[in-house]
Amino acid sequence: MSRRRTPKKRVIAPDALYNSVLVHTIVNHLMKKGKKSLAYMMFYETLSEIKQKTEQDPLEVIQKAVNNVRPLVIVKSRRVSGSTRQVPLSVDYEIGVALAIRWILAACRKRVGKSMISKMTNEFLDASKNIGNAIRKKDEIAKMAQANRAYARF
């Protein structure tokens, strides 16, 4: 265990247009090679497409999608008496949201389609309806945790 002090939690500033920390977090995960303005442009375009398709508040759809994908338990590999076991662990809210965003964006990148904007739109809509590859990933992890719950004490 480290003897150093625990680092301070960084405060994430909300984005300018929607005043939402979640939007800023998603944009940070979406960004590649430091191109934040491109990531913002893509995500704002995704939000406008969601608004056109559903005629609902796009932030509510995004929040619902992230909450649907957010895992409650994950499995971590632990070495126990000479063999490696998958040990289920409960997940904090912030870590769960980060995992959900990562899984949704990974599912977007796997999708077949023309643009990343349309792929993100479809994946967020699917996740808000409890379908799609990100939900499948969450269910897979939950099944693995359920199967290995005997090792939860490690």
Curated annotation (Swiss-Prot):
Transferase is among the record's keywords: no
Lineage: superkingdom: Eukaryota
Annotated source species: Pleurastrum terricola
Principal location listed in the UniProt entry: plastid
GO biological process: translation
Subunit description: Part of the 30S ribosomal subunit.
Protein name in UniProt: Small ribosomal subunit protein uS7c
Name of the gene encoding the protein in the UniProt record: rps7
UniProt xrefs under InterPro entries: Ribosomal_uS7, Ribosomal_uS7_bac/org-type, Ribosomal_uS7_CS, Ribosomal_uS7_dom, Ribosomal_uS7_dom_sf
Similarity field: Belongs to the universal ribosomal protein uS7 family.
Function: One of the primary rRNA binding proteins, it binds directly to 16S rRNA where it nucleates assembly of the head domain of the 30S subunit.
Protein location: Plastid, Chloroplast
Positions in coiled-coil regions: none
